[in-house]
């Protein structure tokens, strides 16, 4: 384990003028894990130039009453409140929760329209897409997170696809959350709905533990990522690699150099296959706080992207997310 002490004074912010959109973060108030407006604001003020953020659903602040399928509207109301605070101008220039990726049970089929419309209204028209978990594996031990497995093969189910069809009608994208062996399921979905942008989360949902902790892990992952990159309506988020399921062995307090070495091959492979115009960086905070501070994670991303041109960096750190999530 590395015992390197980290503080804001220890970290030299790289390329501090680079304008960034954090394409994926959460806010929540869980037992032992509070990450709300003040905590995020502290991170945003840690040195990097964050122009705006994209809030991605995390089952936060659901309504306690009402129809089950509409309880998710509580999260949209919560996001609207956070964005309203930010828009007051009292807390700095970053537009917090400028875009919202909400949760909806797409297996409702056509009836999901009421949920989608409610999410848009309750979020103050910030809804840009929907995310639902499709994580599943034959080995339950690989699920190191807090959400249970989804139904096996849910992305292929007829009820899910009837609901998914409504996304295009509402001009919404889909954030795909699965493990990397399930990427063929995402490819099938993308081919069936070519007019709906699909954003693969967390460089594909790398599984590097249990039966997947093998020497050919990277090549197996790369093969699937390459297949996904050939589908024009698939995008990919760069980050989300601090989870235990990824299987990295850099200890509990990795240095920037260790993270660049571990994460770099995966992130650069995605960039080289998809192109900067279909890649977008994400902090995945607060889950990825286990790897280090907000300022440190952005330094790591900037080091990984150091050899790309200024225009490519602009796409990776800003404009891909801005265009995809319609941030003005």
Predicted regions: what is each one?
Residues 1-19, 23, 35-43, 51-52, ...:
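Mid-to-C-terminal alpha-helical segments outside catalytic/metal-binding sites
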Residues 2-5, 67-182, 188-191, 204, ...:
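Active-site gating/metal-coordination segments in enzymes
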Residues 16-19, 48-52, 92-99, 124-128, ...:
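Short, well-ordered coil/turn segments that N-cap beta-strands
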Residues 19-30, 200-203:
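Histidine-centered catalytic micro-motifs
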Residues 24, 53, 79, 100, ...:
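Conserved, mostly hydrophobic/aromatic
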Residues 30-95:
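Alpha-helical scaffold segments that flank or form the walls of functional sites
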Residues 37-44, 76, 109-119, 220, ...:
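Short, acidic/polar
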Residues 150-280, 291, 309:
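Catalytic pocket-lining loop regions of alpha/beta-barrel enzymes
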């Amino acid at each position: 384990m590395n015992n390197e002490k980290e503080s804001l004074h220890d970290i030299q912010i790289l390329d501090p003028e680079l304008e960034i959109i954090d394409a994926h973060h959460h806010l929540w108030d869980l037992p032992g894990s509070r990450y709300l407006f003040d905590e995020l604001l502290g991170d945003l003020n840690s040195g990097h130039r964050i122009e705006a953020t994209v809030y991605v659903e995390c089952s936060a602040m659901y309504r306690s009453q009402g129809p089950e399928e509409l309880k998710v509207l509580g999260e949209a109301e919560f996001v609207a409140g956070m964005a309203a605070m930010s828009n007051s101008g009292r807390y700095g220039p970053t537009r917090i929760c400028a875009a919202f990726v909400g949760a909806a049970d797409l297996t409702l089929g056509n009836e999901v329209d009421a949920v989608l419309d409610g999410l848009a209204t309750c979020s103050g028209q910030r809804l840009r897409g929907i995310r639902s978990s499709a994580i599943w594996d034959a080995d339950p031990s690989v699920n190191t997170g807090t959400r249970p497995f989804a139904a096996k093969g849910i992305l292929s189910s007829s009820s899910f696809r009837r609901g998914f069809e409504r996304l295009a009608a509402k001009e919404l994208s889909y954030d795909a959350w699965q493990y990397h062996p399930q990427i063929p399921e995402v490819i099938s979905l993308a081919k069936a709905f070519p007019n709906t942008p699909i954003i693969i989360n967390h460089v594909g949902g790398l599984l590097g533990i249990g039966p997947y902790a093998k020497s050919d892990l990277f090549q197996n992952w790369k093969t699937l990522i390459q297949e996904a990159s050939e589908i024009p309506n698939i995008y990919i988020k760069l980050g989300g690699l601090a989870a235990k399921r990824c299987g990295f062995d850099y200890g509990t307090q990795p240095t920037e150099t260790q993270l660049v070495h571990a994460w770099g091959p995966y992130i650069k492979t995605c960039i080289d296959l998809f192109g900067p115009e279909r890649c977008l960086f994400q902090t995945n905070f607060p889950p990825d706080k286990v790897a280090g501070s907000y300022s440190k994670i952005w330094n790591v991303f900037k080091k990984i992207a150091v050899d790309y041109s200024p225009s490519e960096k602009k796409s990776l750190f800003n404009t891909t997310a801005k265009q995809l999530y319609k941030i003005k």
